[in-house]
């Protein structure tokens, strides 16, 4: 089975670094029936007391309104791809090595496996790099 790769918009919001800081943002999206496929959150070491959460996807009028209400913004500097395929040893290494060989620098890469499938989200610096990465990954 070939890898499936697609462009995705990543949304980000600042969160309070305290109990409930993340859940407040996610509850706003959940109330609008936004079905998130990817969530990653972390502290902001350069801004004590805050963190950042990245999510995808957000769509539809209700989802977009909820995102705005919760302080989420589409990240114009993150050119993100969603990769899905069979889980097998070395899958992440194959993807990252192919991108490195093509001179594509990754801003970030997160992946997980469930059962016999894996899904990963990666970000690159430019639209051109994302288009190039899509072609490379689709051939793996």
Residue ranges of predicted features:
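A conserved regulatory-domain signal marking ACT and ACT-like small-molecule sensing domains
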Residues: 1-140
